[in-house]
C-alpha cells in the first residue's frame, strides 16, 4: 500500500497525545504480522478506540467512519485523505462492505469492531455478523485486540475525555480454520464473529507482581 504521509503525521500527533494523557500498557505487538492483508478485531467502548488502537499497530490502518462525518469543505477533504471508509449506520451498507473487502484484497489492514457500536457500560457485548462475513469472504488473518480503560477515559455518556490509562492486548492471529466453518450454513458468518469475539474476550492484561 502506498504510504500516506498525512495519515502518518496524524498518527504521530495522536501517539504523542496518547502517551501524555492515556499512557498504559501495550502487550502482544509481536503478534501483528509484518504485512497485510489483515483484520484487527477489537472490543469497542469509546470514540478513542480507533485512533488510539491505530497508534499501536505498525501499519497504515483503514477505519470505518459514519457517513455524516463527510461534510463539505475540510471534513470531507480530511476523511478522504486519511482513507476512512464511510458507512451508513442506519442499515446494511453494501458499499462499505465492498470497500472493506477491496482494501483487504489490495493487502490493506482494517480495524473493525465485532460488537458494531460502543458499549454502554464498558463490558463486552455480543458480536454481530459483519466482521465474520468480511473475514470469511476474504480469508484473511484476524488479530484479536482488547482495549482496557477507554471507557473510563471517554465512555459513551461522557462529554469530554478524562486522563486515564488505556492499555491494549493483541492476540495471536486467527486463521480461517480458527473462525470459519463453511458447513455451518446460514449461521456461518455469525458463528465466525462469535469465535472472533471469544478470542477477544480471552485476552487479559498480565498480572502485576505483588510488591
What are these regions (language model features)?
Residues 13-15, 81-87, 114-118:
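Short, basic, glycine/proline-bearing loop/turn elements
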Residues 17-19, 78-79, 103, 135:
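A generic structural signal for well-ordered alpha-helical segments
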Residues 1-20:
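Extreme N-terminal tail/first-helix region
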Residues 19-27, 151-152:
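Short gly/ser/thr-rich secondary-structure transition/capping motifs
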Residues 2-5, 95-211:
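Non-catalytic C-terminal accessory region of glycerolipid acyltransferases
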Residues 6, 19-20, 32-91:
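Catalytic core of membrane glycerolipid acyltransferases/transacylases, capturing the structured
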